[in-house]
């Protein structure tokens, strides 16, 4: 920890979520954590329950990057999902691969806390893998997941997710 401060919570809420509405899920989660902001270098001690609960799906960015290199992929399209994929999502991935002459698609699902009523991660994982097996060419898709709770922070969160995919070795992102 480098700094501890009691930053102006209202300023943080405005800059990140563009609202201070306590009903907003991101605002509610942030304000429930208290007023003290901690900053400093990050060191991963463990990956919570994700490694154990999703051993075939959870991957770190470094692991994904290594798998992409092993496959010889240079152009990789990322598709993030917090739900099972439907036919339009499948077609978006195919179109992106074709239009970009991409070597593969990374289907990257969120494994953390989502919206109430969302499909559980194990069900999403099984349905996505079945779709990939049935409808995509062999070795054209990598199905992975990462532990992240939805923030509901709109465009700023979308940029954060794009950075995650870039860190994992993806060159393009479907939004």
Locate predicted features:
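Nucleotidyltransferase catalytic core that binds NTPs
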Residues: 2-175
């Amino acid at each position: 920890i480098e700094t501890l401060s009691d930053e102006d919570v209202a300023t943080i809420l405005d800059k990140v979520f563009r609202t201070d509405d306590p009903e907003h899920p991101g605002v509610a989660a942030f304000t429930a954590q208290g007023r003290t902001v901690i900053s400093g270098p990050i060191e991963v001690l463990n990956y919570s329950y994700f490694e154990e609960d999703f051993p075939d799906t959870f991957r770190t960015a470094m692991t994904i990057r290594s798998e992409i290199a092993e496959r010889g992929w240079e152009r990789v399209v990322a598709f993030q999902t917090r739900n099972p994929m439907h036919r339009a999502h499948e077609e978006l991935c195919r179109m992106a691969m074709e239009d970009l002459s991409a070597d593969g698609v990374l289907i990257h699902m969120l494994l953390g806390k989502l919206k109430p009523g969302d499909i559980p991660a194990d069900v999403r994982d099984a349905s996505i893998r079945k779709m990939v097996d049935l409808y995509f060419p062999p070795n054209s898709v990598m199905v992975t997941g990462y532990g992240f709770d939805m923030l509901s922070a709109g465009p700023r969160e979308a940029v954060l997710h794009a950075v995650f995919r870039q860190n994992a070795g993806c060159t393009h992102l479907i939004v």
